[in-house]
Regions:
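Non-cytosolic head/periplasmic domains of membrane-anchored proteins
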Residues: 123-209
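A mature extracytoplasmic/lumenal domain signature
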Residues: 90, 204-206, 230-232
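N-terminal Lys/Arg-rich, disordered targeting/topogenic segments
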Residues: 1-33
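Extracytoplasmic/periplasmic/luminal assembly and interaction segments
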Residues: 80-131
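Hydrophobic membrane-insertion alpha-helices, especially the h-region
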Residues: 35-56
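Short aromatic-glycine motifs in intrinsically disordered, low-complexity regions
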Residues: 74-82, 210-214
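Ser/Thr/Pro/Gly-rich low-complexity linker/stalk segments immediately outside membranes or between
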Residues: 54-74
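Long, compositionally biased interface segments
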Residues: 209-268
Length: 268
């Protein structure tokens, strides 16, 4: 009996020692596992941040890529109720060539005759030299659809260094935007035409911008505006470019004969 009691006590002592040893081992492991876990999490997060900021960014595949075509069939489009019939080779994106209603329609054309994209002219359309002949056009919805005269008086005059301007090149009046405005590093050129002033914002030449562009923004319908840009090297042709684009947009607004449009649709 005493032997059994002794054995039982010995077992309890052994068990106590075992649990005590295990508990100490768990405590010892806990002491270095928690800092190790914190270190590993911090290391992984730091590595991910470095990869995010330093790795080259991949193209955003959610944004549609320009995909020109040499097709010339007419595409029926609408921008805020304005109906347009535009040859497919003027449209930059395949989605717009499906036709229908859009908030904006992006196009391009080639100076001097504002021709659409073609296989032969593909190198010219893809270039970005200082004298590139490409003109980019955008017809879009515009709630604040100011005339160019209103835009000059209500927006730009508050941001120029001298409201009087100076005599600029090519029959234009030139204004310099102040450095404390969002238009810094740009010049404003105003030309007078029979239909009112024509405004062109042109980025200045600089080592960082060796091939700057000029931008014009003008209303073409109720709540619909047209903007187009061309290289500043072609500023001497501002009047001819404006007239040619006016004729081009008027052509886009012309509704084709029904049988002609049906014939174009059959050829797609």
């Amino acid at each position: 009996m005493l032997g059994l009691i002794g054995a039982s006590q010995a077992d309890r002592v052994e068990m106590a020692m075992t649990y005590s040893d295990s508990d100490g081992l768990i405590r010892r492991r806990s002491g270095w596992m928690i800092p190790l876990g914190v270190f590993l999490v911090t290391f992984v997060l730091s590595a991910l941040l470095l990869i995010y900021y330093l790795a080259p960014s991949a193209p955003n595949f959610l944004e549609e890529q320009v995909s020109p075509t040499s097709r010339t069939d007419l595409v029926a489009l609408r921008v805020h109720g304005l109906k347009l019939w535009i040859p497919a080779n003027y449209l930059q994106y395949a989605s717009s060539r499906r036709g229908g209603a859009f908030k904006d329609v992006a196009m391009f054309a080639l100076l001097p005759d504002l021709s659409g994209w073609s296989d032969d002219d593909a190198p010219s359309f893809s270039g970005n030299t200082a004298d590139s002949p490409v003109v980019y056009l955008l017809i879009r919805e515009e709630r604040l659809n100011l005339t160019e005269a209103d835009r000059l008086a209500r927006i730009y005059m508050a941001h120029v260094a001298d409201n009087k301007g100076t005599a600029g090149p090519f029959g234009l009046t030139q204004y310099a935007f102040r450095d404390d405005t969002g238009y810094r590093n740009e010049d404003l050129f105003v030309g007078q035409t029979p239909t009112g002033p024509q405004l062109l914002r042109c980025v200045r030449f600089s080592p960082r911008v060796p091939s700057p562009s000029c931008l014009r923004d003008t209303p073409i319908a109720h709540d619909v505006a047209l903007s187009y840009r061309f290289k500043r090297a072609h500023l001497a042709e501002w009047r001819q470019i404006g007239q040619a684009i006016g004729r081009l947009v008027a052509r886009f607004k012309e509704e084709p004969r029904e049988n002609a449009l049906q014939g174009e649709q059959r050829r797609r």
